[in-house]
């Protein structure tokens, strides 16, 4: 029997640990999440000014983009399951196409409406229809990104990798309102942020199609449905249970019910917290316009509204990146 080298570990580390996702690919996944969140929160920062310019009551503006959030809630679990069947890259591409199409159409519709070509009512109805593309198809990208990372990352490194992806979502809620005032362009006016973020989304889509390889998962994982990105709200994952990481290879995941006993406390807390956050965001922009007396000059309100939304998002990121790690408030152990 050969002598055992005491300096050599008795068990070799698994080969998968050397196959972490390369930084270039991780940057692409980061960009997909960042673009999705930043574009949506940029829209939220200019819509109060657009609604005032169109002469539409505040409540109808809030309902117009709340409709897409409702579609996101309904469609995201469906796309999460599809990403397990059709591949993560395909669902990312579909989600980015939905994002691009929605923002291009919304930008053109609002541009024509602000120019007086469309009546305010038709402009609002067409805007809500175009936003349906974002809620219906844009919701395919975040679950696919999460599943791509989970399926290609060993369990020991999975939490860190998924935290990075979650931080991109949160960072987008800061960047979107910060950039929106600078995207109010001379020709298209307040519709500028829609068209600029559509261009950014197109660049991201090309990079994903060109640089991201077709996914062949090394580890079992299932798609997870992210909630619609709102300014200042962390990206909660809908329908994820800690036992998902321990699923056997090849096992067919069962379809989770809305009131699954294991998830009921998280669903209720997410429902209450999400509604509270959405109500604040629904009135924050209009409140800023009223308090600053900018109803007569709505274009000047994009900057202050964006600043308020950005401040709320920064507060959330400070808790997510600073307070939670400092207090060691990690997730419960999977075992």
Name each model-derived stretch.
Residues 19-69, 265, 269, 274-295:
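Helix-loop boundary and gating motifs at the non-cytosolic
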Residues 2-23, 213-269:
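Juxtamembrane intracellular "pre-TM" segments in multi-pass secondary transporters
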Residues 130-169:
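Cytoplasmic helix-loop-helix junction between adjacent transmembrane helices
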Residues 97-120:
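C-terminal ends and interior cores of transmembrane alpha-helices
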Residues 69-77, 173-174, 313-321:
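Residue-level signature of mid-helix packing/kink "hotspots" within the transmembrane helices
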Residues 34, 116-140:
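Hydrophobic core of transmembrane alpha-helices in multi-pass small-molecule transporters
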Residues 75-88, 318-332:
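Helix-to-loop junctions at the C-terminal end of transmembrane segments
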